[in-house]
Amino acid sequence: MAVCIAVIAKENYPLYIRSTPTENELKFHYMVHTSLDVVDEKISAMGKALVDQRELYLGLLYPTEDYKVYGYVTNSKVKFVMVVDSSNTALRDNEIRSMFRKLHNSYTDVMCNPFYNPGDRIQSSRAFDNMVTSMMIQVC
């Protein structure tokens, strides 16, 4: 099951973080923050090939004993990070990739809202919040 979904701005500050259970919220914030180093390493290793790709699914960033952390980067360098419970062995790479695509599409809808200021935290979008909730339930 997905326990944390985060949207990180180009400048590496969180635009949106949602986690369950909430008593481990600080732990998930730390995991998301530490995964940004791995994301930067993968992006710099790709070099010029990064410019040619339409989407950048980074795959598994790093596993821990209880969780697996996956990453995705858009062309505008916005990063999506998903922390998944390691006990869920039924999740495949294709399913994680499609979840990131849904998250990216929903993020694009938020960006197209004329009342949203780019770079602000995503707080007032019920549609985005509902989509994240459905993704977290879907993975269970």
UniProtKB/Swiss-Prot annotation:
GO CC annotation: cytoplasm; cytosol; endoplasmic reticulum; intracellular membrane-bounded organelle; nucleus; perinuclear region of cytoplasm; TRAPP complex; TRAPPII protein complex
Effect of residue 37 to Y: In PEERB; altered intracellular trafficking from the ER to the Golgi to the plasma membrane
Quaternary data: Component of the multisubunit TRAPP (transport protein particle) complex, which includes at least TRAPPC2, TRAPPC2L, TRAPPC3, TRAPPC3L, TRAPPC4, TRAPPC5, TRAPPC8, TRAPPC9, TRAPPC10, TRAPPC11 and TRAPPC12. Interacts with the heterodimer TRAPPC3-TRAPPC6A. Interacts with TRAPPC6A.
Physiological role: Plays a role in vesicular transport from endoplasmic reticulum to Golgi.
Domain of life: Eukaryota
InterPro entries xref list: Longin-like_dom_sf, Sedlin, TRAPPC2L
Record-linked Pfam families: Sedlin_N (PF04628)
Protein name: Trafficking protein particle complex subunit 2-like protein
Tissue expression remark: Expressed in testis, liver, bladder, lung, spleen and brain, several cell lines and primary chondrocytes cell line.
One annotated GO biological process: vesicle tethering
Family: Belongs to the TRAPP small subunits family. Sedlin subfamily.
Record Gene3D superfamilies: 3.30.450.70
Localization in the cell: Cytoplasm, Perinuclear region; Endoplasmic reticulum; Golgi apparatus
